[in-house]
From Swiss-Prot:
Matching InterPro entries: Rossmann-like_a/b/a_fold (IPR014729), tRNA(Met)_cyd_acetate_ligase (IPR008513)
Subcellular location as annotated: Cytoplasm
Encoding gene per record: tmcAL
BP terms from Gene Ontology: tRNA modification
Keywords from the named record: ATP-binding, Cytoplasm, Ligase, Nucleotide-binding, RNA-binding, tRNA processing, tRNA-binding
Organism of derivation: Streptococcus thermophilus (strain ATCC BAA-250 / LMG 18311)
Catalytic activities: cytidine(34) in elongator tRNA(Met) + acetate + ATP = N(4)-acetylcytidine(34) in elongator tRNA(Met) + AMP + diphosphate
EC number: 6.3.4.-
Name the record gives this protein: tRNA(Met) cytidine acetate ligase
Binding sites annotated in the UniProt record for ATP: 7-20, 96, 152, 175
Pfam families linked to this entry: HIGH_NTase1
PANTHER family associated with the record: TRNA(MET) CYTIDINE ACETATE LIGASE
Domain of life: Bacteria
């Protein structure tokens, strides 16, 4: 049977995600961000709720991306997620994209010319951001065009790069309805961004989310819930450069700006430059919030939930893969658990995120 991998955040889970799961084949394994997501912000509902949403809509197994995989630029995010899915035995990767290209051929190009392509990236001017350098690499070596705001397409290229030479078949699915960051409510499939913005509109949420009641009754958070704590962390840390990816320039810009702002987005706007993108600044603020220092990734894989098919698949790979089903009996990743502790501070109604929690089972 085909084993299909899906890399996701489900922030929150919506009809577009269900469409993706419906078009995936065989056993469907999801590698999902935990309580903080790739663009550098807390997930609107916790990882357990989002895993349950996925399992109730077609996923067979949901595993957690460690913090240092989940909150990273596209290449590192993709590489870490593909590594986990590869160890779980996937033979195909299904993903949504705004541009349906031959990603398999693109992966082959990278497999053949990776050294030359990475050398090209290194040769580009330092005032370019890493995403800009990567786009120039794909344009030059694979003839890829970039039109407008296409974050899923950029992730698709990162997946192609991560899967190169691994024997994993790439299965792109045309993104349906609104664009990734679209705020439009008059569409066939609403974006996660739009659902977060209009979360109080129950009719809108009901229309575009298969698990709308679960979402609406679950504790929710946003950056606003952590703003004061973030300001405290910036003001009281004597050496911000001890935090992952914070250099002297970023530290200086943060210290200068933090007393002049009243929201995280204002801080992002003041600190971001052409070289330091807003997404990168948000990730850095997330590292500061949770006190992240450079850390190795865990070798074991944390399971959030499974169906019966997913449970059978886990049994078939457990001899070759170190699986953690209950944190406490067995340690997993201290940084992710530290981040979860901070996440819980955002809403007093949030449940314990690790100790005593067991995988969700869906029949």
């Amino acid at each position: 049977m085909t084993v299909t991998g899906i890399i996701a955040e489900f922030n929150p889970f919506h009809n577009g995600h269900k469409y993706l799961l419906d078009h995936a084949e065989g056993i469907k394994i999801v590698a999902m961000s935990g309580n903080f997501v790739q663009r550098g912000e807390p997930a609107i509902v916790d990882k357990w709720i989002r895993a349950q949403m996925a399992l109730e809509n077609g996923a067979d197994l949901v595993v957690e991306l460690p913090f240092f995989t989940a909150v990273q630029s596209a290449d590192y995010f993709a590489s870490g997620a593909v590594d986990i899915l590869s160890r779980l035995g996937i033979d195909s990767l299904t993903f949504g994209t705004e541009e349906v290209l031959d990603y398999q051929t693109i992966a082959d190009v990278y497999s053949e010319k990776s050294e030359e392509m990475e050398a090209f990236v290194e040769s580009l001017p330092s005032d370019l951001s890493y995403p800009q350098k990567t786009q120039k690499m794909w344009e030059k070596f694979a003839g890829v065009d970039f039109t407008g705001n296409t974050p899923n397409h950029i992730l698709g290229l990162a997946y192609a790069k991560a899967c190169a030479g691994k024997g994993i078949t790439l299965n792109p699915i045309q993104r349906q309805g609104a664009g990734y960051h679209s705020l439009d409510k008059e569409v066939s499939f609403a974006s996660a961004t739009s659902l977060r913005l209009h979360k109080e509109d129950s009719n809108f949420v009901d229309k575009f989310m298969p698990n709308s009641k679960l979402f609406q009754t679950s504790p929710q958070v946003s950056w606003d819930n952590y703003f004061q704590l973030l300001v405290y962390q910036i003001l009281t840390n004597p050496d911000l450069t001890s935090v992952f990816q914070v250099n002297e320039e970023i530290a200086s810009r943060l210290k200068a700006a933090v007393r002049e702002i009243s929201s995280v987005e204002e801080l992002v706007d003041k600190v971001a430059t052409k070289r330091y993108t807003k997404a990168r600044v948000r990730r850095i603020l997330t590292y500061i919030l949770v006190g992240a220092v450079d850390n190795s990734l865990p070798k074991s894989i944390h399971v959030l939930g499974f169906s019966q098919k997913g449970q059978f698949h886990l049994k078939s790979v457990k001899k070759s893969v170190d699986i953690v089903a209950r944190i406490g009996r067995k340690p997993w990743d201290m940084l992710t658990q530290q981040a979860d502790n901070v996440y819980q501070l955002g809403n007093p109604e949030l449940c314990e995120q690790n100790f005593g929690r067991v995988p969700i089972r869906v029949k």
